[in-house]
């Protein structure tokens, strides 16, 4: 079931059948951002998640040597090697649904797995994009904010479980597993290697010159 933003839903109540006597209980739950009932557009191409003109080496990606992207949540993620404080921009427009920018520590320590600064943007079709390992206090957007493709989200860093300054970028989709639990699985990513609107303008200018 999808819970709308800024909403809550009571899932159940726990009470003792023997008044005055002690009791114990445990709970188990799972959740994921997005909508598992909707299918993302598999033909969509994303812009690179950093400012135009910036050059980056791919440190890790699907199809190459994999060192840490072994789970379904990161199988198709791409690690872009970037100097700290490099501008990070939205690869696709959407709504910011998650922001963390208060973590300061980073390094190749598994204890830091959940201590990376992150921005998550939700899109139509139920998918999200994740921008991870951002700089401390390096996020310039807030939850609920609508962003456009290419808009500044923050600055790259080296927070959390990280072997060096880079941007971990992933497109994810909420998926319901056979056991009923919900997970955030990564999806294959296609990038376009040019600015479509800019390319069209250049193409039109070239046609005018030829005439």
Predicted regions and their residues:
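Short histidine-centered loop motifs in beta-beta connectors
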Residues: 83, 89, 125-150
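Active-site loop architecture of trypsin-fold serine endopeptidases
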Residues: 103-111, 156-168
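Solvent-exposed, conformationally flexible loop/turn segments
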Residues: 2-10, 200
């Amino acid at each position: 079931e999808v819970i709308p933003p800024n909403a809550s839903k009571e899932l159940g109540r726990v009470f003792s059948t023997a008044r005055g006597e002690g009791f114990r209980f445990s709970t188990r739950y799972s959740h994921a951002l997005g909508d598992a009932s909707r299918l993302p557009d598999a033909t969509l191409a994303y812009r690179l998640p950093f400012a135009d003109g910036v050059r980056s080496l791919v440190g890790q990606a699907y199809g190459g040597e994999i060192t840490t992207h072994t789970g379904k949540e990161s199988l198709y993620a791409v690690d872009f090697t970037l100097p700290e404080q490099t501008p990070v921009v939205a690869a696709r427009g959407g709504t910011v649904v998650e922001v963390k920018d208060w973590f300061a520590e980073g390094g190749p320590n598994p204890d830091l797995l959940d201590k990376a600064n992150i921005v998550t943007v939700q899109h139509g079709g139920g998918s999200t994009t994740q921008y991870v390992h951002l700089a401390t206090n390096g996020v310039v957007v807030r939850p609920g904010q609508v962003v456009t493709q290419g808009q500044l989200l923050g600055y790259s860093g080296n927070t959390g479980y990280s072997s060096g300054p880079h941007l971990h970028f992933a497109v994810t989709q909420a998926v319901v597993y056979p056991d009923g639990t919900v997970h955030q699985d990564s999806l294959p990513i296609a990038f376009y290697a040019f600015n479509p609107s800019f390319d069209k303008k250049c193409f039109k200018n070239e046609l005018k010159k030829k005439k």
